[in-house]
Amino acid sequence: MLTQLKTYPKLLKHYEEIKEVHMRDWFSKDKERASRYFLQFESLSLDYSKNRLNDTTLKLLFELANDCSLKEKIEAMFKGEKINTTEKRAVLHTALRSLNDTEILLDNMEVLKSIRSVLKRMRAFSDSVRSGKRLGYTNQVITDIVNIGIGGSDLGALMVCTALKRYAHPRLKMHFVSNVDGTQILDVLEKLNPASTLFIVASKTFSTQETLTNALTARKWFVERSGDEKHIAKHFVAVSTNKEAVQQFGIDEHNMFEFWDFVGGRYSLWSAIGLSIMIYLGKKNFNALLKGAYLMDEHFRNAPFESNLPVLMGLIGVWYINFFQSKSHLIAPYDQYLRHFPKFIQQLDMESNGKRISKKGEIIPYDTCPVVWGDMGINAQHAFFQLLHQGTHLIPIDFIASLDKKPNAKGHHEILFSNVLAQAQAFMKGKSYEEALGELLFKGLDKDEAKDLAHHRVFFGNRPSNILLLEKISPSNIGALVALYEHKVFVQGVIWDINSFDQWGVELGKELAVPILQELEGHKSNAYFDSSTKRLIELYKNYNQ
């Protein structure tokens, strides 16, 4: 456990020594701070100079990583050891994008050979849709693709397709359906022509309640309009491992793309779950996405900790969570194409590390994953940045932006990028009472009024942030960015001694929903309901009589 590691008390002592130091002072005393605390990898750079740390902090954090045998645990993941201990599974999302030729054997399975076989089928299918060779039941080309999934079968593909929209096939429109409330699927369907629509049903078991409910609604809509169930074969494909259920639905087994237990949902966009990405963007761009992630994998696996982006970001996060007692972490992308990135990272981070039981089954006596949240940075400035600047919570921030200007939008990117830099500077530097008072007096305010108002215009600063810069929003850079966060999450899971690759927390609610659903549908359940739940069931039933 973290608190039992030999470096932990050293970090506690060091924290007490520097907790009151203001970053302003570090910057004023160290003119090289910005250049020393800056890393570049391929087209991605990290400025971590605006963090509440110094060389001693970093030295101790790297010692902490060594205490945890982080290097050995990184190797164990890449080699296919069953590090998902509660489910006795390997964790090989990295193999999905591997460009190495050294085969990985897992329970007599040739992992890379299996992955590349599915990728080959995905490429052929994608080409047939994009080229117009694959036609609908009236011989129309496909114009719309509907991805039906939830969680990891939705968020990654949605994020990537949105981020890389500029690379999409001009004929194709992407739609994503995950919510089971009925509104989303019906809103999507009313825009579509069944004769030119392709549905991708993404569910490993092909029994996920939300996904199957939406898929059956889409199937009913399609059959009613096409007039014959046999047309399903041309318009529905599945990403699943349950061949029997897929065939019962009416999908041809040749239109089923498999993935494996060694790929967790939140790590699956690189697998057949990314079929929608490949069709929308094309195999060339999908390959570039994989390559960007692979290059980050190699960096994570081989770079010294001192220059290793995922290791550094993971350790800095631990520094705030376990020593500064930070409970929250903000993702603030300053690019419209990255608007779904915070939501994707929410699942990646919180479903992986939102746990309090160690690998040995013991209750952990320290904090693990913070609440991860975020929004488009420029919009967030006018919504909740007030709390970040002057509130009572210490919330580290990841600013994410690109250097590349958008065509036909003169002046826009300069305004956007200036705000990234200004906000990061403001969070670091702040504004003292004396500075606020001087500004108000300079503007001509009465001295007594200025003294009172100045208190409200103080910014304490010392708010930490990272600035992640991509040269441009491209397939390879998005691949690298996602892999960076995947590995950051892994690093923190190792430090906290938790299994980052299971998600038992999603199960209990699903189990309890079964008897409640029976009651709502008018069937008697033998389950026990607390008085609150029972009353709400009756309220629903009475309203819908």
From Swiss-Prot:
Q: Please give the biological process terms from Gene Ontology that the record holds.
A: gluconeogenesis; glucose 6-phosphate metabolic process; glycolytic process
**Entry GO MF terms:** carbohydrate derivative binding; glucose-6-phosphate isomerase activity; monosaccharide binding
Q: Which residues cross the membrane?
A: none
Pathway(s) this gene product operates in, as recorded in its UniProt entry? Carbohydrate biosynthesis; gluconeogenesis; Carbohydrate degradation; glycolysis; D-glyceraldehyde 3-phosphate and glycerone phosphate from D-glucose: step 2/4
Q: What keywords tag this UniProt record? A: Cytoplasm, Gluconeogenesis, Glycolysis, Isomerase
Q: Which SUPFAM superfamilies match?
A: SIS domain
Could you tell me what this protein is called? Glucose-6-phosphate isomerase
This enzyme's EC code(s): 5.3.1.9
**What is the annotated localization of this protein?**
Cytoplasm
The top EC class, named as a word, is isomerase
